Curated annotation (Swiss-Prot):
Keywords: Oxidoreductase, Peroxidase. Transmembrane segments: none annotated. It comes from Neisseria meningitidis serogroup B (strain ATCC BAA-335 / MC58). The keyword Oxidoreductase applies. This is Glutathione peroxidase homolog. It holds the Pfam family GSHPx. One of its GO terms (biological process) is cellular response to oxidative stress. The active site is at C35. CDD domains: GSH_Peroxidase. InterPro entries: Glutathione_peroxidase, GPX_AS, GPX_CS, Thioredoxin-like_sf. PROSITE patterns: GLUTATHIONE_PEROXID_1 (PS00460), GLUTATHIONE_PEROXID_2 (PS00763), GLUTATHIONE_PEROXID_3 (PS51355). GO terms for molecular function: peroxidase activity. Belongs to the glutathione peroxidase family.
Length: 177
């Protein structure tokens, strides 16, 4: 089983075979429109605009599991992101990333990369989650905007914590292009 074996639905409900992304560098992100990290959409779009011609694709999976910060329908989320942040990358149907209803793609991603690579803000971020009563099991997605970086061969090479900004992983992306 690998990244290209999955089929997901896009924001309009159309089936998308991830095998269509073979040979591309992928940044897979679980997102929300009403999160303190939502401004990362702007930086994601900048990365996409700068590197899509070289083979970068960003796959956006909205998720409402973290304090219900993505309450809109998938189609509405796509519209909000396009209007507010000018996003042009692929937005998929809303999914769950933890628990009994975890999307199979995310179960796979978490099994391959169970630990977040954090930055200087990550420890504080995890402590804030704990203070809010947000308990996570080992390997769980901690919050919105966790990012998985996949190379051109479909190998998941890194999992970045929500606090790691798109700008901070630009060099990692460039190295794979």
């Amino acid at each position: 089983m690998g990244i290209y074996d999955f089929q997901m639905k896009d924001a309009e409900g159309n089936a998308v075979d991830l095998s269509g992304y073979r040979g591309k560098v992928l940044l897979i992100v679980n997102t929300a429109t009403r999160c303190g990290l939502t401004p990362q959409y702007e930086a994601l779009q900048k990365l996409y605009a700068q590197y899509t011609a070289e083979g970068l694709e960003i796959l956006d999976f909205p998720c409402n599991q973290f304090r219900e910060q993505a309450p809109e329908s998938s189609g509405e989320i796509a519209q909000v992101c396009m209007m507010k942040f000018g996003t042009k990358f692929k937005i998929f149907d809303k999914i769950e990333v933890n628990g009994a209803n975890t999307a199979p793609l995310y179960a796979y991603l978490k099994s391959v990369k169970p630990q977040d690579k954090g930055n200087h803000l990550f420890k504080d971020f995890v402590l804030k989650l704990a203070a809010l009563g947000e308990k996570r099991d080992e390997g769980d997605i901690k919050w919105n905007f966790t990012k998985f970086l996949v190379n051109r061969d479909g190998e998941v090479v890194e999992r970045f914590a929500p606090s790691v900004t798109p700008e901070e992983i630009e060099a990692d992306i460039r190295a794979l292009l």
